């Protein structure tokens, strides 16, 4: 499968945050920002909203535990968008930053769906979150098979599997008390779609 069409291939480069809302006093207020920030998928296993039921399936995770450092509770740069399964597996464990560790150069996704970590941080993350459980490996194989078949026989299905969700958040309508990176709103998926610059798939 071409790398451009591989839905379980990790990013090439470390993620640089484009949004910076601050001042909220509840974590849920960050959700629309995090959805857009992390492309509507889990930063750990790459599960996408369009493959599941996002309302119940995705959580907001504090990368560094809040206990002992309450200032991190509402720190946007400490928040991640993750699937519920990965969030449960992580729990309160201290793990490497997935935005730095889970890169295509550090994680090989084998044909059988198994993740092979090539660096110590990637290996630790894969082990701590148990990303090579049978269910995870079978899920990767299934998603790859669907995308492969759709690319040959059903381009509409391919667009759904690799496309953005319909309910993109309009971040320009949100009013956080402060925003350290306001320019990011113009780079949001909603804004790019409105300007005709959002790709059909990713």
Predicted features, each with a name:
Residues 2-44, 67-74:
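Short, charged surface segments at domain edges that flank catalytic/cofactor-binding sites
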Residues 90-157:
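Conserved, surface-exposed functional patches that form binding/active-site neighborhoods
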Residues 30-57, 83-85:
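Short cysteine-rich loop/turn motifs with clustered Cys
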Residues 47-81, 92-108:
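Histidine-centered nuclease catalytic patch
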Residues 128-202:
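C-terminal, charged low-complexity interaction regions
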Residues 6-7, 50-51, 73, 77-93, ...:
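Short, surface-exposed, charge-dense and proline/glycine-enriched linear segments
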Residues 9, 13, 17-20, 54, ...:
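Amphipathic, alpha-helical segments enriched in basic
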């Amino acid at each position: 499968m071409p790398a451009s069409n591989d839905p379980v291939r990790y990013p090439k480069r470390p993620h640089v945050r484009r949004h910076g809302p601050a001042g909220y006093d509840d974590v849920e207020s960050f959700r629309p920002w995090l959805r857009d920030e992390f492309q509507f998928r889990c930063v750990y296993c790459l599960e996408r909203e369009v493959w599941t039921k996002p309302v119940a399936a995705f959580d907001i995770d504090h990368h560094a535990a809040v206990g002992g450092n309450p200032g991190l509770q509402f720190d946007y740069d400490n928040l991640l968008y993750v699937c519920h399964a990965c969030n449960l597996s992580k729990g309160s464990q201290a793990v490497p930053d997935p935005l730095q560790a889970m890169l295509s150069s550090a994680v090989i996704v084998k044909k059988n769906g198994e993740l092979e970590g090539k660096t110590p941080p990637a290996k630790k993350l894969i082990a701590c979150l148990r990303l090579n459980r049978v269910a995870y490996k079978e899920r990767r194989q299934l998603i790859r098979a669907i995308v492969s078949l759709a690319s040959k026989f059903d381009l509409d299905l391919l667009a759904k599997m690799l496309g953005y969700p319909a309910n993109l958040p309009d971040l320009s309508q949100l009013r956080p008390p402060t925003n350290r990176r306001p320019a990011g709103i113009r780079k949001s998926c909603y804004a790019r779609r409105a300007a005709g610059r959002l790709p059909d798939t990713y």
